[in-house]
């Protein structure tokens, strides 16, 4: 029991420090660009031929979707995002691999960064804008980058874990061991977080 409490404490301490670090980086970047871009002509700073820093507020969800429903949806976004962050934190504490732990930390850090914006500013501040000729990618921020990186890590971790389980099954195991491993794969495929 004491070992379980120690593991939970270490997981909580590590995850919280990673999440807080990511939130601080996100909020400092937003603060700096809000403070400096508002005085830039056209609210835009050209960095390269394909990258601009722009001053824009996102009242919708990712990439500005549903922004026309802002007056009805901000409270719903706040509640939904908070519940999702809590659920992801629960999954992270249950995670058994470094990859899933890191992936959840990045997703939660990014989600909390955007949640802070929505809670205290009423919208999410976006400032990174990639474009090339007539193509223009939606404006985003570092929190969005953290979420994307976290999802990529989680997908890679899932694939690697599944490969390890499949390799173990190919070995010389008795039927009970094979059935136990297959059950873990089924649980993982159904959205569980069990890993071998």
Curated annotation (Swiss-Prot):
It is a multi-pass membrane protein. It catalyses: Release of signal peptides from bacterial membrane prolipoproteins. Hydrolyzes -Xaa-Yaa-Zaa-|-(S,diacylglyceryl)Cys-, in which Xaa is hydrophobic (preferably Leu), and Yaa (Ala or Ser) and Zaa (Gly or Ala) have small, neutral side chains. Its EC number is 3.4.23.36. This protein specifically catalyzes the removal of signal peptides from prolipoproteins. The active site is at residues 126, 144. Keywords: Aspartyl protease, Cell inner membrane, Cell membrane, Hydrolase, Membrane, Protease, Transmembrane, Transmembrane helix. NCBIfam families: lspA. The chain crosses the membrane at residues 17-37, 73-93, 96-116, 135-155. GO terms for molecular function: aspartic-type endopeptidase activity. Belongs to the peptidase A8 family. This is Lipoprotein signal peptidase. GO terms for cellular component: plasma membrane. Its main location: membrane. One of its GO terms (biological process) is proteolysis. InterPro entries: Peptidase_A8. It is an enzyme of class 3 (hydrolase). Pathway: Protein modification; lipoprotein biosynthesis (signal peptide cleavage). The gene is lspA. It is found in: Cell inner membrane.
């Amino acid at each position: 029991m004491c070992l379980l409490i120690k593991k939970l404490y270490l997981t909580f301490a590590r995850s919280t420090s990673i999440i807080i670090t990511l939130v601080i980086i996100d909020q400092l970047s937003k603060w700096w660009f809000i403070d400096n871009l508002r005085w830039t002509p056209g609210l835009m700073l050209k960095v390269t031929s394909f990258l601009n820093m722009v001053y824009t507020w996102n009242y919708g969800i990712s990439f500005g979707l549903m922004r026309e429903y802002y007056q009805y949806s901000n409270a719903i976004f706040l509640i939904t995002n908070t519940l999702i962050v809590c659920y992801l934190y629960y999954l992270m504490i249950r995670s058994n691999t470094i990859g899933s732990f890191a992936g959840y930390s990045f997703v939660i850090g990014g989600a909390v960064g955007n949640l802070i914006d929505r809670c205290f500013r009423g919208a999410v501040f976006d400032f990174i804008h990639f474009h090339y000729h007539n193509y223009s990618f939606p404006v985003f921020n570092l929190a969005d980058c953290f979420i994307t990186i976290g999802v990529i890590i989680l997908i890679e971790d899932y694939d690697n874990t599944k490969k390890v389980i499949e390799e173990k099954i190919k070995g010389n195991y008795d039927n009970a061991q094979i059935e136990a491993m297959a059950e873990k794969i089924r649980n993982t495929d159904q959205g569980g977080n069990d890993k071998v």
